[in-house]
Amino acid sequence: MFAKAVAGRNSLSWLQVNDNGSVTLYVSTLGKDYLKPEVPLLLIRQGKDIYSTIRQAYQALMKNTEAADLKSRTAKEYFEAFRYLGWCTWEHYHDDINESKVINDMKTIEASGIPIRYVLIDDGHLAHKNRQLTDFIPDKQRFPSGWKKIMSYKKENKIKWIGLWYSLSGYWMGLSPENGFPQVVRQALYPHAGSLLPGTDSTRIRSFYRYYVSTLKEQGFDFLKVDNQAFTLPLYMGGHESIRQATDCNRSLEAETHRQNMGLMNCMAQNVINTDHTSYSNSTRVSIDYKKYDEDMAKSHLFQSYTNTLLLGQTVWPDHDMFHSCDTVCGTLMARSKAISGGPVYLSDAPRDFIKENIFPLIDEQGKLFRPEAPAVPMPESILTNPLWSGKAYRVAAPSGNGAMTLICYNLNVSPRHQQVQAIIKKEDYSLRNSFEKMSATSEERVLLYNWESQKAEELSDSSTFELIGFTDKLFHLCPIRKGWTVIGVQEKYLSPSTVQTISLTENRLVLNVLCTGTLKVWIENSSKQELRSISIDTPKKIVIEK
């Protein structure tokens, strides 16, 4: 059985797990209003397997306009920039940024030979007083030219898009009474608990976010990363219609970014009000922050990212956060996890420190990401467990191209007693491929197991067992054998099956559209002979292979 807290027009439920293992359900207005006699309490669904149960629960939630304003991930557009590799200022600079640093790094990125297509300017640019926003223009000391100089570095075939970080409520603690907003915008604000907030009615809140988005769009930005969303509700708490007003903030941001054709990356937006009101946006953070060189935090980050995707992945692509390609602790693991997530992938190292070997396997020559058909989620045995303490391997998978399933096995254990764990891949794992999404059932097929690291292939007739020593991962592709052929894809890319499109396949002939350069791997069976053929691809093209 699956149960999830929900919001009403001006009510919010939540679950608390007690010390004795019992669970308490709460519901409140979180303010001065009385709770109505009837309010939504829980989203509940029972089913035969966890994937279909959660999917059906969210389908029911999408139909309930009192509790949510949602569309499924597959029904929404995905912002074009997020299909490409990006770079973010945060983990390298934190909030110590200025105009010259950003411009110098954009120049270094362009000279690096790595096709990074968007730059995201994170916290550190805002005009504020006591962590309250004073205006939607950057700090004049740090950015004396405003955004004009930085925008001049946009190029159609280089850094094409630039995004900007803001908080849903303006800044961390809301809006400052000492602000430079136009009078018409000030009239849409009211004081509460030491801050100015948009409100109190829906029209005023919408007018504030119309100004918010249009001001940043006029300055040249293509998308916004809107952070601190979950803390907007606490800023409203204790007043009248606290939940309704906080919900209107999310609704208005969604409506205005959509209307003004601005991309939206939701960040720290995991409370019910945030998650259940993504009517247009299609990317949300699913974990704590990534921190370079921090092994324990990296393990928790991976665990959270995949587990939370079981829920959030119903309505958005998961954002696994930025990463450092030069991270000697987990740079390669992070790169592969971003690949299988299907969400935005953006670096955060100093551009001079980029490690190309961890970056190029993610993308084609234009910086376009190779993405799965659906986000990676935990395999059944890895769902109701804590892989940091389980003493077992943690397995996640996603459907990738040409009928393949891409699977990563991790050792995320923190105890020294479990530095070595055993992982098993079984043939029946492949039958779960279409359980992750509502796809047509997978027929009984022969399956090829391809080890990405060793570049070895074998038919998976029963199971394959291997060891995971220390904080590590192993990447595999489970590919169907059809008419004596298996298309694995371009070896140099993490998501090899997503690098090739099958045009036609007969007993003796295979026609493919190969999407990037590299070494194409194809398994071929002819009479009693089996061959893993390597074909050099010097340019993306259509090719014909004969047995």
Which role fits each region the language model picked out?
Residues 172-217, 251-358, 374-385:
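Glycan-recognition surfaces
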Residues 1-118, 140-143, 161:
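Carbohydrate-recognition beta-sandwich/jelly-roll modules
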Residues 93-97, 126-130, 169-175, 231-235, ...:
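Flexible loop/turn segments at secondary-structure boundaries
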Residues 80-243:
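Aromatic-lined carbohydrate-binding/catalytic grooves of carbohydrate-active enzymes
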Residues 80, 102, 112, 143, ...:
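Active-site-proximal structural scaffolding
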Residues 85, 361, 369, 375-376, ...:
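Short helix/strand-capping turn motifs
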Residues 338-341, 346, 385-445, 475-482, ...:
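Carbohydrate-binding surface patches
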